From Swiss-Prot:
Lineage: Eukaryota, Fungi, Dikarya, Ascomycota, Pezizomycotina
Protein name listed in UniProt: Velvet complex subunit 2
Positions of the Velvet domain: 164-474
Localization per Swiss-Prot or TrEMBL: Nucleus; Cytoplasm
Reported phenotype of the disruption mutant: Leads to a significantly hampered growth when cellulose is used as the sole carbon source. Decreases strongly sporulation and down-regulates of cellulase-coding genes.
Amino acid sequence: MPSLIPPIVSASSASNSAALDHLYHHQPPPRLPLGAVPQSPIQSQAPPPPHLHPPSHHFQLHPGHGHHQQPHHERDHRLPPPVASYSAHSHHLQHDPLPQRLESSQPGHPGAAEHRDHPQHALDEPSRSHDPYPSMATGALVHSESQQPASASLLLPISNVEEATGRRYHLDVVQQPRRARMCGFGDKDRRPITPPPCVRLIIIDVATGKEIDCNDIDHSMFVLNVDLWNEDGTREVNLVRSSTSSSPSVSSTVTYPYGSISVGESSHTYGQSAHPPSREAPYSVSQTASYAPEYQTQPTYSQGSSAYPSNGTYGPPQQYFPQHQAYRTETGPPGAMQTTVGGFRGYAQDQNALTKMAVVGGQPQGMFTRNLIGSLAASAFRLADTSEHLGIWFVLQDLSVRTEGPFRLRFSFVNVGPLAGQNGAKVNTGRAPILASCFSEVFNVYSAKKFPGVCESTPLSKTFAAQGIKIPIRKDANLKGGDGEDDYGD
């Protein structure tokens, strides 16, 4: 058998081959075939010896360079481990954090320094990249859950103690409002909320903790006030910009709380002009008014509260923007962009504020009016419920809402009778504190086309009507065609 003659390798080629072999240990291996199993993560995380760290510029070489010169024994070392080895360590890949994997590496394992598999790192990174997203989603869920108790706490009833008498007052909305038809801005066809809200007043003796008999209580000075709030119970919506049409659309009406409109000279107050200002003296008005740039013949001012064209024509109701506390001069000199009118000092608004206040001629401007109309205060009555149990009740049978949407009613109870220190007085001439308050459930106000019909008269309403309370009782549904009819009887 002929002896094998070793190949003759020059010094330059030997040095190049050694350099390529040295670099190859630090190049990414070829991609694994489809059926191959990735390498063990514990072996892939083993730190290399210090003498094998290459310079940073070596990683910028082409990975395919010198691939065909790889020795056979190195290829054997880079074969994937058995399936059992991978399955044994797959549990650590899913649950163990990165520092634990580094500590659990086996430095004595043969070829541990050579098993640095960069594709395995690429497989490991997506699994770690998904870790922040569950934490972020969990944080958002915790934040939303923390917001729910905050909003729910606003809807909790308030029960206070009257120190002079030692009584605690509590309101219980026994009959909740369900739906109503929007009445618009005309008073001829006003439909009340059905069924009428019925609130029972419960008085507890603080000393004994028991309910006081209503026959022992003088309820002649008890008053229940009601106002309108949004469905979340975070903002009152008692004001709305009125219109001359009897059935305004939702887009032309905006509700506002009482606190957003006030009278004064501060920069946070808003005024309304009952009549359009004259052309000759557009700056003499003490209250704020604005002119449309399409009709202007001289420098004008604009605010989100109203929009009056200077030629005497008017537009439909526009939205009121309390956050815009500024005036704008379109045709005046640049020095006139900052001015003072009627005690207000402001700066020019952006163009978006004027686009929101587009003026269309044909209808006069409206004024702010109440959104909840009717009898907003009710006196107390001693009535018997359906189980013949006497109690102090407040019945609000005359409430209507001008605009459609979901709302809540807030009930506030006060005692306007004389205080303990007012001897001989019949009426409280000072302030009356709110002794109890609560919210109703959410009810919906529909437009005339979407209104499903008034609710049937409840047994409680019929019981109170039989005792002299003026509650509109629905006529027999069989005579008038069902729930869709709006006929009432007394």
